[in-house]
């Protein structure tokens, strides 16, 4: 049975500047596992895409003067597994299967390419999306890091 060795929770306003904040926080947090550069880039890219999707899509049409947040929970397990849960209380996704198709976008095609979920899926080992219209969306990603080199084999 895997055991949680560390956990981080963030609540950030849904503002584009906070996408970089989330990336920086997760980079520092997962450093304790000493991921490879490729693994770190994968984690940062997947998280960045999930946060950006929340910022761009979750609160579209909502009042600007009301606070809107993105919730991020990251767990590190003794098995060198990392889980990242990104959620919002926004509009939700009506049809997850359709939304996950490459090139699908609810925005203007000239502004959005509809590759967000594909990017998240390709940079992680698993991707799960749950959503309720009018209640929000949760994206759960899992990344398994390469084993630590054993003593003497470095």
Please describe what each predicted stretch is.
Residues 23-48:
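Conserved short strand/loop->alpha-helix "switch" segment adjacent to the catalytic nucleotide/phosphoryl-transfer site
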Residues 13-14, 35, 91:
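Structured loop/turn residues at secondary-structure junctions
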Residues 1-9, 54-154:
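Conserved beta-strand-loop-beta-strand hairpin that lines the nucleotide-binding pocket
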Residues 49, 53:
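Conserved polar catalytic motif of the HATPase_c/GHKL fold
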Residues 9-21:
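STAS-typified acidic loop motif
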């Amino acid at each position: 049975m895997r055991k949680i060795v560390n956990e981080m929770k963030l609540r950030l306003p849904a503002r584009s500047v906070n996408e970089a904040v989330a990336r920086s926080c997760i980079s520092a947090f997962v450093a304790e596992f000493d991921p490879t550069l490729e693994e770190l880039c994968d984690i940062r890219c997947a998280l960045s895409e999930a946060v950006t999707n929340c910022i761009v899509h979750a609160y579209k049409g909502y009042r600007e003067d009301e606070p809107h947040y993105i919730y991020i929970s990251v767990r590190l397990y003794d098995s060198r597994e990392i889980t990242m849960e990104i959620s919002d209380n926004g509009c939700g996704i009506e049809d997850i299967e359709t939304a996950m198709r490459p090139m699908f976008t609810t925005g203007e095609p000239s502004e959005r390419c509809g590759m967000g979920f594909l990017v998240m899926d390709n940079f992680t080992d698993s991707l799960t999306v749950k959503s309720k219209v009018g209640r929000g969306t949760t994206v759960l990603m899992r990344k398994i890091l390469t084993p630590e080199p054993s003593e003497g084999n470095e």
